[in-house]
Amino acid sequence: QMNNLPLGIDIVDHKDIEKKIRFIKINALKYTSETKKKFDLILFKQSIHFLKFKEIKKILRFSKKNLNSKGKIIILALHPKQNHWPLFRVFKTKLVKSLIKDKAILGLIKSSFKKYKINYFKFQVEMTKDSYLKMIKNRFTSCLLRLSHKELKNGIEEIKKKYKKKL
């Protein structure tokens, strides 16, 4: 049982707001540097890789400062080596580059904390190719965000030719 609703912070407004989480639209670096609140848990969900290394150092420092005495920081990220997604050429290039950065970020995180624990989990997913293509069209991962319309369209065609109906 929680006494307070969890707080979600993002730089974009969310349309699909979870009623069990209070969301505010603000830059996380700004919020963590200015807040006087203390937290039991600070969770970074697939977002830390959007920051520059200098910003990551700052946000980790501010986050540690904002923890209660037994508080925890959890950072969710992709496993740097075990990602088996159906990929098209440009997507693969972007993903490899992103995972290299994630590995460097992991090193930075390790050097920022005396005590840390790393857990990996494997989540096996089966879906239809059509469902996956819709996810690609919606740019479900940050690797797809900056692709041009043409690159995305060509990638979708590549996936259609390269993979079976069930992924």
Task: Please identify what each model-predicted range represents.
Residues 1-32:
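Class I SAM-dependent methyltransferase SAM/SAH-binding core
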Residues 57-72:
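A short glycine-rich, Lys/Arg-flanked "PGG" loop and its adjoining helix->strand segment in the class I
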Residues 72-102:
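Conserved class I S-adenosyl-L-methionine
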Residues 90-106, 118-124, 142-149:
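Acceptor-substrate binding/catalytic loop of class I
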